[in-house]
């Protein structure tokens, strides 16, 4: 995945037509498009392939299963054009290693801590431990919340500079893109504040400009 704008679009649309229109409008501004189950369940897994023709695609499936099932999901997503797949780290080393082994050159990002308030109840308490496990298992990067920049710093202190950190929660959830980058994130992830706006391209450009202020 290129590292130009440091901006990733979380395209949580359920309409394939609208998703493609938004993807086309932000082409050249965002470094990747992240899709989740709502779009895939509504329009089918072929959306991975169609969007991959416009941008790198991150499949945010937050895979949390036994190793064999993890392997099947990752292989399927990559075969359809995914550049990366997001998996949960709490499943343990065997499932994480299965994801890495099945990636076929695509990148695997492990969730250490999600961006919503409820994340602090359980997984946040083990974020650093899961980050260390991810490094041991060979994942390419980690998910840490832009809504809590101090947690980005904590994960960065564990994983070092050789691993990517992607930070969701910018925009609608209250996080600020430049704060996340300043805290150590490589990319910020923005969803509704871009695809739900009247002018997605202008909104994406505004977030990219905010990021540039700290580069």
Model feature map: region roles:
Residues 1-59, 64-72, 79-82, 121, ...:
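Conserved N-terminal beta1-alpha1 strand-loop-helix module at the mouth
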Residues 2-7, 65-149, 161-162:
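Conserved anion-binding
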């Amino acid at each position: 995945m290129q590292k130009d704008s440091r901006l990733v679009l979380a395209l949580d649309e359920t309409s394939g037509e609208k998703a493609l229109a938004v993807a086309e409008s932000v082409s050249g501004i965002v470094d990747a498009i992240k899709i989740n189950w709502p779009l895939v369940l509504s329009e089918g897994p072929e959306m991975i392939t169609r969007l991959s023709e416009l941008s790198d695609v991150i499949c945010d499936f937050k895979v949390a299963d036994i190793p064999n099932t993890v392997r099947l999901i990752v292989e399927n997503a990559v075969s359809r054009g995914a550049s990366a797949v997001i998996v949960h780290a709490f499943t343990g080393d065997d499932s994480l290693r299965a994801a890495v082994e099945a990636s076929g050159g695509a990148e695997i990002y492990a969730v250490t801590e999600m961006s919503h308030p409820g994340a602090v109840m359980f997984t946040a308490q083990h974020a650093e431990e899961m980050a260390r496990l991810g490094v041991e298992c060979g994942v390419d990067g980690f998910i840490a919340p832009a809504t809590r920049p101090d947690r980005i710093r904590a994960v960065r202190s564990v994983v070092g500079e050789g691993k990517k950190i992607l930070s969701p929660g910018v925009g609608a959830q209250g996080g600020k893109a430049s704060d996340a980058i300043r805290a150590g994130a490589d990319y910020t992830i923005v969803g509704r504040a871009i695809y739900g706006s009247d002018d997605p391209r202008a909104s994406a450009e505004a977030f990219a400009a905010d990021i540039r202020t700290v580069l």
